[in-house]
């Protein structure tokens, strides 16, 4: 695993962290509080497989930083963004998620990670969504994706395969402000 030279990092144990950007506020049905700002970004600190490992094994079996993860030198992940337009707004709702890559595609991603113009060198790569988003009625794990590399400092864009999964439909058609609030309340209840 050391050949990828990733900085090991301990992640928090909650499966979803709330990295937020905001719009006008709302009253939360979960906690009853008035929140001045509407969250438009959520993310997981690690791929789902990482959470299945015993905490005492994570440092030994995983190499991870904020953007890349290798587990047991056989599972390779990159962090990216599923972007969903917010209808009647210029805002984007963003899920920061982890996607698995083949070893070959991970090596190419790693090789170009800090190279200017990397987005021109790397074609879209197949991956499996490796983040569980609990506010969907069907599992989001293992949805088919394409990983689109963007300029250095910008997380890859994650394009879901066009299916009838609710997340895929939302990525194609957008979501309302009411749906953003529904997601915020669902994640509030799950925290």
Residue spans of the language-model regions?
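Basic, glycine-/proline-tolerant helical and adjacent loop/strand elements
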Residues: 4-87
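Compositionally biased, intrinsically disordered low-complexity regions enriched in proline and serine
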Residues: 5-10, 111, 137, 158
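Weak global preference for isoleucine
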Residues: 12, 71, 82-87, 94, ...
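Generic alpha-helix signal with a bias toward terminal, lower-confidence helices
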Residues: 28, 47, 52-56, 89-90, ...
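Extended interfacial segments that mediate partner engagement and assembly in macromolecular machines
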Residues: 54-132
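C-terminal, charged low-complexity interaction regions
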Residues: 114-191
């Amino acid at each position: 695993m050391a050949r990828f030279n990733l900085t090991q990092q301990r992640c928090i144990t909650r499966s979803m962290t709330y990295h937020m950007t905001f719009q006008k506020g709302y009253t939360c049905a979960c906690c009853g509080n008035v929140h001045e700002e509407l969250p438009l970004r959520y993310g997981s600190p690690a791929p789902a497989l990482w959470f299945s490992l015993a905490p005492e094994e994570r440092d030994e079996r995983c190499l991870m930083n904020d953007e890349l993860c290798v587990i047991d030198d056989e599972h390779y992940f990159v962090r990216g963004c599923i972007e969903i337009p917010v209808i009647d707004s210029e805002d984007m709702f963003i899920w920061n998620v982890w996607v698995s890559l083949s070893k070959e595609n991970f090596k190419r991603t790693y090789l170009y990670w800090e190279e200017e113009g990397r987005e021109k060198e790397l074609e879209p790569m197949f991956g499996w969504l490796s983040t569980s988003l609990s506010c969907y009625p069907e599992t989001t794990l293992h949805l088919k994706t394409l990983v689109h590399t963007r300029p250095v400092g910008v997380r890859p864009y994650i394009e879901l395969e066009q299916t009838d999964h609710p997340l895929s439909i939302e990525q194609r058609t957008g979501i309302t402000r009411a749906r953003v609030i529904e997601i915020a309340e669902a994640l509030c209840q799950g925290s």
